[in-house]
Amino acid sequence: MNQIRDTASDAPAVTIGIPVYNGERYLEEAIRSTLAQTREDLELVISDNASTDRTAEICRDYALRDTRLRYFRNPVNLGAAPNYNIVFQHARGRFFKWLAHDDLITPTYVAKTTRVLEARPDAVLCNSVVAYIDGMGGALGLYDTQLAKADVVSPSQRLAFMTLRSHSCVDFFGMFRKSALDGSLLHGSFHGADRALLAQMSLRGRMVQIPAPLVKMREHEHRYTRAQARAVDRASWHDTRVRRRVSFPTWRLYVEYLKMVQSAQLEPAERIRCSAVLARWWMLNWNAARAVVDVVALVAPGIPGVAERIKVRLFGAAPGHLVAARRR
């Protein structure tokens, strides 16, 4: 793995990690928004998945301008999941945030979210309301993830909030306490891994929301949720090692839920309540139907995308990026 610039002697308080592959169109904006933060004791770790466009050139140029940027390049494209985990493995800060290469954070995002986490040792995650933008940066609308509802004492209530409602997992890109992520699932190599990590974090601590749009998430045609409709393509996007491997993402997600509830440090009564939450999970948000689609996808790889389009046409989109996209 190639690396550019790792000269800082003192560990920063915050790490922002950008995993990227062929991100030349939007990457510079993401870099600039990070380096322009009002809280300056941060590092920006970029892991490049062997990009073939100008990504490496852009990263090297900014690394020469600002010593807070640490650039790593993988010899081959490992897939998104390993690349997300690589930036975390290089993180030295007490607080950590993943930033998609096509998204932006406002100048006070780091200062405000870390201030909350410093004042709230019981919290593992802080994020803000999300402002959606289009490919040109135009406003599409706001998305309130209602993360404040996970700011409760009961782990089972937090788990229910993260698993039983329909949401687009944007809080995966919130500011985490790094110690809470240590030993966690991080980004698993399966569709729904972001949902699994948020559920695991809900068992480890409370989650706090800042009721102001401090992060901008971009909607465009090349976004993963739009570009990868077939099950095999989704699996390969997550991890190139699983190309052509049978994938049952809904079943995998449920198994991960079961494992995290069994391994979490919970009182017996609370563990029972968490298990009851997972029993309800099958009956909500089309999860049972998705499990059937996983099996059908063995012989009809395009069926997940077809099924999702039919559901959206008949019943509407889930809250989040699909709702914002329809406003264009």
Where are these regions (language model features)?
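Glycine-rich, basic loop-to-helix element that forms the pyrophosphate-binding segment
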Residues: 74-91, 104
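A conserved acidic beta->alpha catalytic loop
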Residues: 48-57, 76, 100
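Short aromatic/hydrophobic "clamp" motif used to bind/position activated sugar donors
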Residues: 96
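N-proximal low-complexity "stem/linker" segments adjacent to membrane-targeting elements
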Residues: 1-33
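Conserved donor NDP-sugar-binding/catalytic core segment of glycosyltransferases
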Residues: 108-142
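Cell-envelope/extracellular polymer assembly enzymes that use nucleotide-activated donors
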Residues: 12-15, 43, 196
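Conserved nucleotide-sugar donor-binding catalytic segment
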Residues: 89, 106, 151-231
